[in-house]
């Protein structure tokens, strides 16, 4: 008895294994570098915005250079764009594990970036108003001070929601994908899946006034997420995806072969 093998993808030309592995390495490297960019670009921002955030009215009505605030704004733009980049670059891989999680990851990154950029616009408006306030007097000066203070508070709230709430959500999506696929050591996504609820809880506590946005509890609860994102960036940059994880993905997505007896 002979057999006839029908393969669903028989007409599809598959890339050579070496070419496929090179493509996966490129994706991992790009995703890892972008993650490291978001991490590095976000570190100086707390210091650069300190003068404005600690004393909004004093900053608006005071004199001096805006250089630190402008650099901080530029780094926030870099952080926002690199954040979107991580989700877009990794999409060809993440969608193979869960299309819903992959789309959710991209969506949450876009929302996060949008919130960050709204904050940047607010900061740049404060810089402009600060220059206008130099020659203002009376009611106009008071109006500029109040508006400037409100814009600083807007920046703080968008920053809280962007780098707190949305960061927790997008790390839940990525943590789930990485844990399920074993593309990186499982301890890395476990840290992310633990850290995401913690930063969501911290963001909620800050919104309801339990503690300040810049405080010991807020910093402590953000550490696991910071460790997760840094570890993802380093691992993907240095090591790439684990071969065993890629092999499992290939096996899961391989076309099903049906063997039927010939008549």
What residue spans do the PLM features occupy?
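Hydrophobic, aromatic-enriched alpha-helical segments typical of multi-pass transmembrane helices
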Residues: 2-263
């Amino acid at each position: 008895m002979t057999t006839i093998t029908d393969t669903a993808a028989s007409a599809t030309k598959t890339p050579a294994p070496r070419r496929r592995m090179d493509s996966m390495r490129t994706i991992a490297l790009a995703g890892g570098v972008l993650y490291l960019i978001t991490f590095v670009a976000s570190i100086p921002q707390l210091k650069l915005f300190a003068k404005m955030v600690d004393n909004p009215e004093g900053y608006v009505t005071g004199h001096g250079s805006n250089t630190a605030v402008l650099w901080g704004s530029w780094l926030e733009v870099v952080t926002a764009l690199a954040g979107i980049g991580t989700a877009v670059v990794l999409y060809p891989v993440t969608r193979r594990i869960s299309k819903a999680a992959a789309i959710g990851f991209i969506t949450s990154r876009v929302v996060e970036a949008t919130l960050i950029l709204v904050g940047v616009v607010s900061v740049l408006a404060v810089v402009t108003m600060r220059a206008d306030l130099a020659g203002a007097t009376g009611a106009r000066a008071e109006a500029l001070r109040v508006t400037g203070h409100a814009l600083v508070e807007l920046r703080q709230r968008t920053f809280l929601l962007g780098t707190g709430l949305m960061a927790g959500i997008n790390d839940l999506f990525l943590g789930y994908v990485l844990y399920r696929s074993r593309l990186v050591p499982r301890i890395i996504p476990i840290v992310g899946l633990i850290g995401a609820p913690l930063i969501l809880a911290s963001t909620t506590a800050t919104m309801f006034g339990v503690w300040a946005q810049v405080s010991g509890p807020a910093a402590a609860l953000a550490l696991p997420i910071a460790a997760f994102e840094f570890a993802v960036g380093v691992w993907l940059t240095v090591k790439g995806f684990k071969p065993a994880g890629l092999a499992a993905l290939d096996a899961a997505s391989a076309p099903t072969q049906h063997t039927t007896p010939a008549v």
